[in-house]
UniProtKB/Swiss-Prot annotation:
Pfam families: Fer4_7. It comes from Dinoroseobacter shibae (strain DSM 16493 / NCIMB 14021 / DFL 12). One of its GO terms (molecular function) is 4 iron, 4 sulfur cluster binding. One of its GO terms (biological process) is aerobic respiration. This is NADH-quinone oxidoreductase subunit I. InterPro entries: 4Fe4S_Fe-S-bd, 4Fe4S_Fe_S_CS, NADH_quinone_OxRdtase_chainI. NDH-1 shuttles electrons from NADH, via FMN and iron-sulfur (Fe-S) centers, to quinones in the respiratory chain. The immediate electron acceptor for the enzyme in this species is believed to be ubiquinone. Couples the redox reaction to proton translocation (for every two electrons transferred, four hydrogen ions are translocated across the cytoplasmic membrane), and thus conserves the redox energy in a proton gradient. The lineage of its organism: Bacteria, Pseudomonadati, Pseudomonadota, Alphaproteobacteria, Rhodobacterales. The keyword Repeat applies.
Amino acid sequence: MAQMDYTRAAKYFLLFDFFAGFKLGLKYFFKPKATLAYPHEKGPLSPRFRGEHALRRYPNGEERCIACKLCEAICPAQAITIDAEPRDDGSRRTTRYDIDMTKCIYCGFCQEACPVDAIVEGPNFEFATETREELFYDKEKLLDNGERWEAEIARNLELDAPYR
């Protein structure tokens, strides 16, 4: 019993715990840093990353959305509102496609439900706004997002194709 007390006292007076912690700190001090200097450096994004919403167009310029309203029905947050009208050729197209980004939970159900890959969640995660009204996306804003991110969205969908 007395031997154990001497060992504890020796460790205490020789600052054993202090030097053990100092050694651990030095070990990690010389390793490469794991943090990034955001916004100057950005980490890689997965092809499955779900960011800002976008509506896509076909290569001929026609919008892909066929107004089936599956995305509106499956949205658990009820963030999507769609109005549609039939066209002269018998097909339907949306007249109103709104997403309330303040309600959206970025679950990706809308993207999974869409039979024509019209609504997608793009790679953009930096869409801070100054007013709440800017977070209500209408059809034009969504189509603009789709045009801006089309190359990256198409690449991500192609990379994700084996898993769908």
